Amino acid sequence: MLIEHERGFVLHVRAWRETSLLVEVLTEQHGRVGLLARGVHGPRKQALRAALQPLQLIQFSAVQRGELAQLRQAEALDTAPRLVGDTMLAGFYISELLLRLAPRNDPVPELYACYTQARTHLAADLPLAWGLRRFERDVLEGLGFAFDLQHDSDGQPIDPAARYRLDPEEGALRVLSERLAQDRRETVTGAALLALGEDVMPAAEDMPGLRRSMRSVLLHHLGGRGLKSWEMLEDLARRR
C-alpha cells in the first residue's frame, strides 16, 4: 500500500543497523505507522534526520509492506516544541503512552486530536499536571475506555465531598470504609472527578489523587506493564 503526503507526529525513533532508523509515527488516516528510514546518515540527509525527531510534525510518503512501511520522503511541517525539565518528560510521556496504546495501522482520529492538543498545551507552558490529566481522559475516551464522571458505579450522582476508587471496568466506586476514605494514596475526591468531567481544573490538593487514580486505570489498559516515563518522573520527584 502506498501512503502519500500523510501528516503525522513522530512518537519514537531508534537506530537500526548502521545507517537506518525505525520510526513510529501517529497519523490521523492510518493510525500508528512503523517506518523504516534507510540510509539517513551523511550530510545530504541532515534535514531528514532533523525531521525524524520525537514530537515533530512531519509530512511523509512511504510504501507499506507488512508490519513496517519503507519511508520514501519526509519533511518537517513546523518546529517541534523546545521542552525542558518537567515539560520535556511530559512530552516523552504523551509519546510513550500512545506508542503503547495506539493500535498499529488502525486509524483512531481521536488519538491524533488528543496528541495535537497535548503538544500545543506543552508548548504554551500551561498548567502541566492538568494538561496531562485531560490528555489521559481523552485518550481513554478515544479508545472506548471512558468511564462516567457524573455518576458512580451504582448509578448515583457523584458526591463532591465523598471519596472514590476508579475501577477500569466499573468506573467510580464510592469508598464507604472510613479507613480507605482517609487513604488518599488509593482514592480520589468526587470533586476532582466532577471537575475532570466538566473540563475544569480541580483544586490543587485534589490533583495528586487524580493523578494516581488515572495512572491505575491506564496501568490496567497497559497490561500491567508501566511506562519508562513514569519511572523517570518518580525518580525526579525523589531527587527534589
UniProtKB/Swiss-Prot annotation:
One of its GO terms (biological process) is DNA recombination. Coiled coil: none annotated. SUPFAM superfamilies: ArfGap/RecO-like zinc finger (SSF57863), Nucleic acid-binding proteins (SSF50249). Keywords: DNA damage, DNA recombination, DNA repair. InterPro entries: ARFGAP/RecO (IPR037278), DNA_rep/recomb_RecO_N (IPR022572), NA-bd_OB-fold (IPR012340), RecO (IPR003717), RecO_C (IPR042242). Pfam families: RecO_C, RecO_N. GO terms for cellular component: bacterial nucleoid. The keyword DNA damage applies. Belongs to the RecO family. Involved in DNA repair and RecF pathway recombination. NCBIfam families: reco. This is DNA repair protein RecO. It comes from Xanthomonas oryzae pv. oryzae (strain KACC10331 / KXO85). The gene is recO.
